Curated annotation (Swiss-Prot):
Residues 22-55 are annotated as: Left arm. It comes from Bombyx mori (Silk moth). It holds the Pfam family Chorion_1. This is Chorion class CA protein ERA.5. It comes from the Eukaryota. Coiled coil: none annotated.
Length: 119
C-alpha cells in the first residue's frame, strides 16, 4: 500500500467517525440503560474523570458570526434537508431592509432530546 493510499484511508476513517459520532444524544451508544457507563470511554471532559457520564463532544456548540458593513444582498435562499445548526439571528442598529426572516428547527428523533419544533 502506498503512502498516499494510506493517508486517504486514514482521512476516510476520520470522516466516517465524525459523521457517525454526532447525534448519539445523552444516552450514549448502548441505549438508555447502559448509556452513562459509556461516557467515560470518550475521555475526560472536565477534570480528572468523565463529565457527568458524557463524552468529550456531543455534536453541539456555540458559535458567533459577526458581519459589519454594507451588505447589498438580493434574492432568496432555501435550505432543505438536515442542517446541523442551532442558533439565533440578531439585528442591531439601523437596517433599511424589506423582506422577512424565518428560522425554524427541531431536534431529530435520534438526538435524544425529544424537543418539538420551535419557530
Amino acid at each position: 500500500m502506498s503512502t498516499y493510499t494510506f493517508v486517504l484511508f486514514c482521512l476516510q476513517i476520520c470522516l466516517i467517525q465524525n459523521v457517525y459520532s454526532q447525534c448519539l444524544g445523552r444516552v450514549g451508544p448502548g441505549g438508555p440503560p447502559v448509556g452513562p457507563y459509556g461516557g467515560p470511554l470518550g475521555g475526560p471532559g472536565y477534570g480528572p474523570v468523565g463529565y457527568g457520564g458524557c463524552g468529550g463532544y456531543g455534536g453541539s456548540g456555540i458559535g458567533n458570526v459577526a458581519v459589519a458593513g454594507e451588505l447589498p444582498v438580493a434574492g432568496s435562499s432555501a435550505v432543505m434537508g438536515q442542517v446541523p445548526v442551532i442558533g439565533a439571528v440578531e439585528f442591531a442598529g439601523p437596517a433599511c431592509a424589506v423582506g422577512s426572516v424565518s428560522i425554524s428547527g427541531a431536534c431529530g428523533p435520534t438526538c435524544g432530546c425529544g424537543g418539538s419544533p420551535y419557530y
